[in-house]
């Protein structure tokens, strides 16, 4: 297990003290003044990669800030821990596991050693099985129980087994199959699966069930509902093998369900759920895009992996993104982070990154199990930017909390409609400028005077129209949302998460907060049956809520 017990807390590092003092000095500065003082600011605080331009110049930082943040990364041994992760060491200490989702997209020919075994043959074997199945389904050669080809794929999973494939297939829909429709079910509510199944033909549907243990409550509840719906039409348990495949490690339960051995895809415990779309969990991606599209996604991520490993810290996009985030969170005290894609293709990206960031770094103790005295992950939230402008941007511009934002846009749209993309991107560029510059009272007075508003009326409303600005943002400009670029974008954020977890000295690759809720839900579910005894062990609120629910549903 990688040694995480003897470490220096971030607050005890010299650079932390330097940054704390420096933040107090900079809090009286305005970002627009920093631009006025330095014509080369953009080039100093941006990184151009083949697939992503990362501009962080609209943050309240100077060259002194950058130097101190880089010192923090050095003193935190980010480079050493990066090497440990890529070498397959057990940096997931609470579960005693390697963290090797990066191995799934490694396009070199080098051995991938994990726990003394070269994982490359197993990875390549699963990729080959994904290729064969996806090509067979997409070509129409995969036949259902009545001899018809597949027209619809229903992916059943939750968390990382759902969010990743859903986000990617939505983002790359323009490149996907027009004859194979993709559907996703995650919610145990029942409404979602009922909506998905309505109108589908049992003779032409393929279900992909993704559950590492094949016991995940939400996933298996939906899987059993799908099975019942299918069997009502097929009336032959043997037909399940032609309409269900699984991604799981529990072969015994999967085969008992009726899924053929050759249609069970493997997972590994060194791949966390929220980082698993690169594995067979990404089978829906291969089915939608075709296997070559899935390989392009892996290629884009691999290119970012190489950049993360090889680029100097000061020109390393994941490192600088992580450091700017820590500066905003821990030294300027900003409580949240907005993700604002200005590309409809990326409309599921904020939800995907919510899980990736908050499930990874939403922790309250350090490696030694001690409560931390500093903030960990901020609240991550967002929406497609142009919709957000007419919803919550009012708060971003004039609210009492300053919320840093990542603006993500593309130079070329995946679907071109005359005039639309330039109109979209005009808003994209304008919003980051407006958040940074703001508008002061004198400017407001001049504008209102020019419109003929009376002096008395101006004084009544001037303060309501003032925007203080000084609201930080990052801009990520992509050439186009395609598979390689999306792979690079996802990997950029993955490595940002890793770097921040190392600096915060928290375990980024477990999720015990998720596990607690599962345990309690399993205990409560039997109590909801009519006639079941009440459990006096619950707190008064939970006990009475359960009683009210049971009484009302009789």
Tell what function each PLM region has.
Residues 7-146, 423-425, 429-456, 500, ...:
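Extended, charge-enriched "interface" segments that sit outside catalytic cores
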Residues 106-119, 173-180, 371-373:
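Gly-rich Lys/Arg/Thr-decorated short loops/hinges at beta-loop-alpha junctions or inter-strand turns
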Residues 132-140, 146-311, 523:
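Glycine-rich phosphate-binding loops that contact phosphosugars or nucleotide phosphates
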Residues 151-157, 207-213, 336-343, 379-380, ...:
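Short glycine-rich or small-residue beta-strand-to-loop segments that form or flank ligand, phosphate
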Residues 168-173, 198-202, 223-225, 261-262, ...:
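Short, solvent-exposed amphipathic alpha-helical segments in soluble enzyme
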Residues 229-418, 425, 438, 469, ...:
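Active-site phosphate/pyrophosphate-binding segments
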Residues 397, 409-487, 491, 497:
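Substrate-recognition/cap regions that form aromatic- and gly/pro-loop-enriched pockets
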Residues 474-531, 538-553:
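C-terminal helical/tail subdomains of lipid-metabolizing enzymes
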